[in-house]
């Protein structure tokens, strides 16, 4: 009988949030988009980690910080199979089930360079639409609709 040693590839946290099963190559973008680094707390990032589910994954751990259900659901746009776990005393005390939000405000940038959201002091605002497995976002201001990946890569 063969034995295997399993060890954590990213250090455990005592208290905070773990966002696991993020698609590989998306972790840094999520940190930036959702301003997850706007904290003095320690953040641990694992990129291209092995995953039984998808081959490779990214992982984010934020100590002493807890995502609201609304914040977690906004992550579902780009990491629909991600898990968001609340950790207390090194144990998972709550698992958030992600679902697409109806709208995303003050996070994304409209890809339309003529949109007023670029030049006016307004927060971006998108309505989320899901049809036949495709996710699109409609800008509140210019009313143009974009594939969610187009918006993800807009800066």
Swiss-Prot record:
Zn(2+) binds at residues 110, 115, 139, 142. Binds 1 zinc ion per subunit. One of its GO terms (biological process) is 'de novo' pyrimidine nucleobase biosynthetic process. GO terms for cellular component: aspartate carbamoyltransferase complex. GO terms for molecular function: metal ion binding. Its cofactor is Zn(2+). Keywords: Metal-binding, Pyrimidine biosynthesis, Zinc. Transmembrane segments: none annotated. Belongs to the PyrI family. Involved in allosteric regulation of aspartate carbamoyltransferase. HAMAP family: Asp_carb_tr_reg. Contains catalytic and regulatory chains. This is Aspartate carbamoyltransferase regulatory chain. It comes from Yersinia pestis (strain Pestoides F).
């Amino acid at each position: 009988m063969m034995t295997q040693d399993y060890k954590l590839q990213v250090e455990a946290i005592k208290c905070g949030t773990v966002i696991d099963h993020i698609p590989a190559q998306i972790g840094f973008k999520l940190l930036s988009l959702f301003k997850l680094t706007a904290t003095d707390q320690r953040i641990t990032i694992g990129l291209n980690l092995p995953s039984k589910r998808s081959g490779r994954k990214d992982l984010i751990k934020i100590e002493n910080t807890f995502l609201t259900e609304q914040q977690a659901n906004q992550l579902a746009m780009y990491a629909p199979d991600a898990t968001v776990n609340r950790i207390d005393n090194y144990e998972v005390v709550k698992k958030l089930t992600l679902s697409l939000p109806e709208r995303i405000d003050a996070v994304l940038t409209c890809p339309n360079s003529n949109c007023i959201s670029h030049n006016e002091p307004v927060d971006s605002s998108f309505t989320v639409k899901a049809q036949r497995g495709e996710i699109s976002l409609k800008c509140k201001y210019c009313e143009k609709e974009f594939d969610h990946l187009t918006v993800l890569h807009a800066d």
